[in-house]
Amino acid sequence: MLQSNRLAIYAIGKIKKLWIRDGINQYKKRMPELIINELKTFNLNNLRSNNNIIICLSEEGKQFNSVELCSLLLNFKNKKINFLIGDTDGVSSDIKEKSDLVLSLSPLTFPHELARLILIEQIYRAISISNNSPYHRS
């Protein structure tokens, strides 16, 4: 079973759009253990350990459907899963190279603030799938 206390989102910058912040807060209420940090820069040294997985979001990344994403996250067993979201310019090639996985949410390009909301919804959906909750309808 996938649990939100093993998941964290690290994103560059603050959310300025109120409607996105409200959407994120709705999912945060459902997953209070989920860590969401707004940063100025990424420090991979703090995230890198034997028990951590780093997943960087980029439009060039690998795409999964919701069930496949759930399966992927479940395969990481007891590891802490850290998602990195860049700013308007994305993440650097250095961060992508040092990540365990580069993930794309879609072939479409989204503003970085909206990508956070979509990622949080997909995390909630993955948790729901792993718990056999009726939220996900395939």
UniProtKB/Swiss-Prot annotation:
CDD domains the UniProt entry points to: RlmH-like
Cell wall biogenesis/degradation as UniProt keyword: no
Gene3D superfamilies, sorted: 3.40.1280.10
Catalytic activity line of the entry: pseudouridine(1915) in 23S rRNA + S-adenosyl-L-methionine = N(3)-methylpseudouridine(1915) in 23S rRNA + S-adenosyl-L-homocysteine + H(+)
Source species, domain of life: Bacteria
Signal sequence coordinates: none
GO CC aspect terms: cytoplasm
Classification via Pfam families: SPOUT_MTase
Its job: Specifically methylates the pseudouridine at position 1915 (m3Psi1915) in 23S rRNA.
Protein name: Ribosomal RNA large subunit methyltransferase H
Provenance organism: Prochlorococcus marinus (strain MIT 9301)
Lineage: Bacteria, Bacillati, Cyanobacteriota, Cyanophyceae, Synechococcales
